[in-house]
Amino acid sequence: MKDLIVLTGPTAVGKTSLSIALAKAVGGEIISADSMQVYKYMNIGTAKITEEEKCGIPHFLIDELEPDEEFNVTIFKNKVMGYIKDIKSRGKVPIIVGGTGFYIQSVIYDINFNEYGDDSNVRKKYEAMAETIGKSELHKKLALVDREYADSVSENNVKKVVRALTFFEMTGEKLSEHNKRERERRSPFDFAYFVLTMDRKKLYERIDKRVDLMFDMGLVDEVKALMAKGYDKSLVSMQGIGYKEVIDYLNGRTSLEECIDIIKRDTRHFAKRQLTWFKREKVVTYIDKDEFGTEDKCLKEMLRVYNS
């Protein structure tokens, strides 16, 4: 029996429903590993779990921050380590659920991200560069020093591009090589790490349907409400897929149809990058929804691994 469970997989694969069934089966409590669901007021565009869907299972790192508050991998790791200790102290099983593989890795391998000192000046330099030369050119600069990491991150994810460039300048080491070495570390946990997958074509169809549903549920109004509160595109939270595109639509830069198509395209690309990340992880159990057929059969296999 393991002392920590991780359930991850690409966006829209169906992690939420299975995580609730898993938590009920093992007496678990859920910690979100989603870099967007931590923000308040951002419900539709993040496909945030509802109170009804939680079925009474305690959830952490959902709706904990204002959209203008800072959230990064270091903050995530520190919070999660505290939640794991708290959950275990009550005789429950911590279950980390979400698709942000880098965040998950930081916890299960106890990675120290502050080992090279204060990087604020270097980081600010690259943040300013993103404004002056543009995110595409900044991404090209990253590719020159760390092609592998650049291939794994979108040019739209300026925060990660800046971090990788900052890390390289501060240490002289590629972040991709640093991450590989950290993955070789011995984990402080005896964990079960599940990656939920399905046929790529079916996944992309689910993504397209989810995006259509988001607009039916009122994504445009959600973004309008956020903007009315003073939250704009300069915030990391508002750079999330679905939010920045709707802002462009509201500002007249795209039509609604173009906006929807861009969100679908970028979400599919995001899912592809997630799958690439998970393939790097060594100690994982893949749960193929097509192979197992039903959620009950997926759960049965997960419980077998958890109890082994």
Language-model regions: role of each:
Residues M1-S308:
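Phosphate/pyrophosphate-binding catalytic cores of soluble transferases and nucleic-acid-acting enzymes
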